Design a protein with these regions (language model features):
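Glycine-rich phosphate-binding active-site loops on the catalytic face of alpha/beta enzymes
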Residues: 62-70, 110-120, 159-178
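Hydrophobic faces of well-ordered beta-strands that scaffold small-molecule active sites
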Residues: 7-9, 38-42, 60-64, 86-90, ...
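N-terminal active-site wall of soluble small-molecule enzyme domains
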Residues: 8-78
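Catalytic cores of alpha/beta
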Residues: 46-56, 94-105, 146-162
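Conserved, mostly hydrophobic/aromatic
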Residues: 9-10, 54, 109, 134, ...
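Alpha-helix-loop-beta-strand connector modules within alpha/beta enzyme cores
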Residues: 20-40, 77-89, 125-148, 181-183
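Active-site beta-loop-alpha junctions enriched in small/polar residues
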Residues: 12-14, 43-47, 67, 91-93, ...
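Alpha/beta enzyme core
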Residues: 1-9, 52-60, 99-112
């Protein structure tokens, strides 16, 4: 995937979301030899338990869910202590207003345009309003994840980064799929 700017890695614990994916050692093994920077998304109940491990990889950013159980300030500070960018993700039904007090502390807000935990879902069009709302914060990067494909990419207009899992991974030509999103 030479045309991908980074690799987005979803980590699910089976508690915050019903799906549980691979353990850290499995992820580390899968990513062995991968030179692209990683964008790690912790869809877990206790993100503080995961930061040290994922910071040890080629990680440029760790994002965690605002709805998780750990203290948001402490989690942001822990991520930054490793010299890594901190991102805060919000579910489709979480208003931007709920995370406003953290926006000066994080580097990125990840707008979930589907409910986390399952791939292949349809883009929830109402989440486009959150992108527009977040664009008022000049130093903030906006990332959108969920239901992104060549037909929905325009609904993520205003975002700095998009995550497209199913569309790219289920394509017969990864490079062509990625390029269709960039153009």
């Amino acid at each position: 995937m030479t045309s991908a700017d980074y690799i987005h890695v979803d980590i699910m614990d089976g508690e915050f979301v019903s799906t549980k994916n691979y353990d850290f050692d499995d992820i580390k093994l899968m990513l062995d030899g991968v030179s692209k920077l990683l964008d790690v998304h912790l869809m877990v109940k206790h993100p503080l338990d995961y930061i040290k491990d994922y910071a040890s990889l080629n990680t440029k950013q760790i994002t965690f869910q605002a709805e998780a159980d750990d203290d948001i300030y402490e989690t942001i500070n822990e991520i930054h202590s490793y010299g890594i960018k901190a991102g805060l993700a919000i579910n489709p039904d979480t208003p931007v207003k709920q995370i406003e007090k953290y926006l000066d502390l994080v580097d990125t807000v990840l707008v979930m345009s589907v409910y986390p935990g399952k791939g292949g879902q349809k883009f929830i069009s109402e989440t486009s309003k959150k992108i527009e709302e977040l664009n008022h914060y000049s130093d903030l990067l906006i990332e959108v994840d969920g239901g992104i494909n060549k037909d929905t990419i325009d609904m993520a207009s205003g975002a700095d980064m998009v995550v497209s899992g199913s569309y790219v991974c289920e394509s017969t030509d990864y490079e062509k799929a990625i390029e269709s999103l960039k153009n």
